[in-house]
Amino acid sequence: MGKKSRVKTQKSGTGATATVSPKEILSLTSELLQKCSSPAPGPGKEWEEYVQIRSLVEKIRKKQKGLSVIFDGKREDYFPDLMKWASENGASVEGFEMVNFKEEGFGLRATRDIKAEELFLWVPRKLLMTVESAKNSMLGPLYSQDRILQAMGNITLAFHLLCERANPNSFWQPYIQSLPGEYDTPLYFEEDEVRYLHSTQAIHDVFSQYKNTARQYAYFYKVIQTHPHANKLPLKDSFTYEDYRWAVSSVMTRQNQIPTEDGSRVTLALIPLWDMCNHTNGLITTGYNLEDDRCECVALQDFRAGEQIYIFYGTRSNAEFVIHSGFFFDNNSHDRVKIKLGVSKSDRLYAMKAEVLARAGIPTSSVFALHFTEPPISAQLLAFLRVFCMTEEELKEHLLGENAIDRIFTLGNSEFPVSWDNEVKLWTFLEDRASLLLKTYKTTIEEDKSFLKNHDLSVRATMAIKLRLGEKEILEKAVKSAAVNREYFRKQMEDKAPLPRYEESNLGLLESSVADSSLPLVLRNLEEEVGVQEALAIQAEANENGLVNGERSFPNGTRSEEDLKQEERKRAKGDAKESSSDSTDAVKE
């Protein structure tokens, strides 16, 4: 949102006069599509694939230099037109102004005192760019024929944005002209800036984002050049990778879900004015009023005249903020790292553990989270770890007898341990696992802090190093917390303290002190699901059109604990090899 526009905005009136042969670009994009549709690389080979894809993309960018349609002047020059347009079409424009807040970029500043929970901003549907408005635009005929556009609302919005940007008479021109000219998402990172994310959890999503975007561009370049319904689009003579990267990032950093006009389902939308608000910790204070058919936002807190107006974007980790929003949020109370856990099928007690977990509604293998806040684990992760560490006798107690159901219900309740021994085992396991994850990083926490302090880094490089530092700090906190808990329960066991008794009124699988206890099970977020959908759809379409000869491999879900440990060992070994062979990394850091 506002924060994502910190970078310089480059604009000019029309596309440049440079020419490049469509056949030449078509040949390069076909090669790019082939590369991006090949099977996923093996462990330790992702960086090599990323560099190869990037090399092709840069070759295309170089040939297309000067062909994009951009605007004259600075972004802020268009803010008065945006406010006028919004006011004329029923949006609220009183009580705030758009201002550059330096570190956070552009945002909204209160021009009067605004009380907490006061409705201060509303934007009617007619101003929003939505999948529905895209279907009713010049993009409609192509949308009706293309399965990717139909399956992927975010891609539809990106093309809607590009088509309207190329139309000087577009209703949305005042909004589009006010958008940033570029972003700080990893799609804009230089190769050296991406290198700072080596060994982090986030790097895999960064690679995936870059590969997916390149594949989409390559696929749609051919569609625009060859599909009969693309003939009338204003993109045929000028559809550059730079254009697509900008549109994808604009949508990625700004898209939100709103209900359709009849309220029967949700659709994706870009919301002018509102998307200028920067993020802070808090609660969601934006909703959609179906009766008045408008997006409405109430104040998160009291804002005095002259103060920046913030909103809360949601319970996102810093990895999600960096990858999908293009900024790092210091002191993010919802920051977390992923931890893959699973019961090995070679475990002698696998069947019993799987049954107990199934009754608790927890899969035998999943991606959980370790949280920035205390306690570091959710009720669901606690329940999983308890089952993971159970003895045969403890498993029987949770499967048989009149109290079995009650025991299942208390698995996630931190007040009622299965046994002192079970608690010691689970906290020992978590301590060991978090320690193992920490060892996969090339640098230490102290080295990252020193590097940030002593080097003049770009905004994007700073974000990358802060992100890897944040991951390590969460893991280190988890190690320390697990060690404290391990010793506490060991003492309880040594003292033969009585186990707490539970009452029926205390039951509840997810009743614990951890906020967002449902987060770990939905950690495979919309972007991941959408990525698989998009890849499947593109592969089907490409095969149908004879564009791709190779196969496409997809993740088969989570693997066993044993497999995951093996992968982490390989990752650590691979990182060590990269570290020893990469002289530029050693010099820079």
UniProtKB/Swiss-Prot annotation:
Residues 94-314 form the SET domain. SUPFAM superfamilies: RuBisCo LSMT C-terminal, substrate-binding domain (SSF81822), SET domain (SSF82199). It catalyses: L-histidyl-[protein] + S-adenosyl-L-methionine = N(tele)-methyl-L-histidyl-[protein] + S-adenosyl-L-homocysteine + H(+). Residues 559-589 have a biased composition (Basic and acidic residues). Belongs to the class V-like SAM-binding methyltransferase superfamily. SETD3 actin-histidine methyltransferase family. Residues 10-20 have a biased composition (Polar residues). The keyword Methyltransferase applies. GO terms for molecular function: actin binding; histone H3K36 methyltransferase activity; protein-L-histidine N-tele-methyltransferase activity; transcription coactivator activity. Coiled coil: none annotated. Its EC number is 2.1.1.85. Interacts with MYOD1. Phosphorylated by GSK3B, which is required for recognition by the SCF(FBXW7) complex and subsequent degradation. Ubiquitinated by the SCF(FBXW7) complex following phosphorylation by GSK3B, leading to its degradation by the proteasome. The SET domain specifically recognizes and binds actin, suggesting that it does not accommodate substrates diverging from actin. GO terms for cellular component: cytoplasm; nucleus. This is Actin-histidine N-methyltransferase. GO terms for biological process: actin modification; peptidyl-histidine methylation; positive regulation of DNA-templated transcription; regulation of uterine smooth muscle contraction. It is found in: Cytoplasm; Nucleus. Protein-histidine N-methyltransferase that specifically mediates 3-methylhistidine (tele-methylhistidine) methylation of actin at 'His-73'. Histidine methylation of actin is required for smooth muscle contraction of the laboring uterus during delivery. Does not have protein-lysine N-methyltransferase activity and probably only catalyzes histidine methylation of actin.
